Amino acid sequence: MKSGASAASPTAKSFNFGSSRLLALAQQLRVYKPPLSSSFDEREELLAYKESTRKSITHVGFQESMAPVRFRPKKAAVLICLFEGDDGDLRVILTKRSSTLSTHSGEVSLPGGKAEEHDKDDGITATREAEEEIGLDPSLVDVVAFLEPFLSQHLLRVIPVVGILWDRKAFNPTPNPAEVEAVLDAPFEMFLKDENRRSEEFDWMGEKHLVHFFDYKTGDSDYVIWGLTARILIRAATVVYQRPPAFIEQKPNLKYSKMNQATRLYGWLKPLANLHESCENGRLLGHVPAYCLRYLVGISSR
């Protein structure tokens, strides 16, 4: 997504603008550009994938021309929908996923999902998914910024889309029971505070990462916001409030570039040469059995 945020937003005249604080925030975010150091151009990304998959796939006799498409991470987008609470604080809309879902069931997440072919940009993806999941009319959301991409554990390239809900009263949540169990909102600034927060180290793709857990209580319900959702919200709050969190987000020695991450990930496909020979049906998915891929790199079958 290289176009400006306004490309995915309705015209300003369609919104009932709220406080001067929200107006100032919208102006601030419209000029935001993700840091070059934390991402890379899609052309460079594709070249990296082509090179890394070429080295891996030639070992198992796959057609090289198919590698960039078959093994490239799919795109997704999530909506960081901000609005002004009754006390004047910024709040963000979250969902509790249905307990019947096959992945991340019952977890707190941001509205969003995978991109579809007809989606013109990441803003369309995020707002479309939000409408499908919680009944949030895209015309109510003013898309103002796109953050740098995050890679999920299921190898989705997730783009956080920041939108402003100028009139909270115009939104009547209608969760889709097949996907969402509950709709909630939380104070946005909590993701910069070292309160009701803990962290643990987890291994992922051969590296150790700090995973943050935020405990949040509203009414009679207790929620835990963690993992990728917490990472995205920490980053988004850092951008919005223009200050770092009051805790260590990631240990310096645990950081590494996304380019190295991509190269290392696809280098893991080399063991497919031996594993493929032991699989009874090597023609599933045309080339590689789906369960072999999931075993090696955790690719979701969905």
Curated annotation (Swiss-Prot):
EC number of the protein: 3.6.1.-
Binding site residues for Mg(2+): E129, E133
Cofactor(s) it depends on: Mg(2+); Mn(2+)
GO molecular function, one term: coenzyme A diphosphatase activity
Annotated ranges, domain Nudix hydrolase: 73-229
Predominant location: plastid
Family: Belongs to the Nudix hydrolase family.
Function according to Swiss-Prot or TrEMBL: Probably mediates the hydrolysis of some nucleoside diphosphate derivatives.
The name this protein goes by in its record: Nudix hydrolase 22, chloroplastic
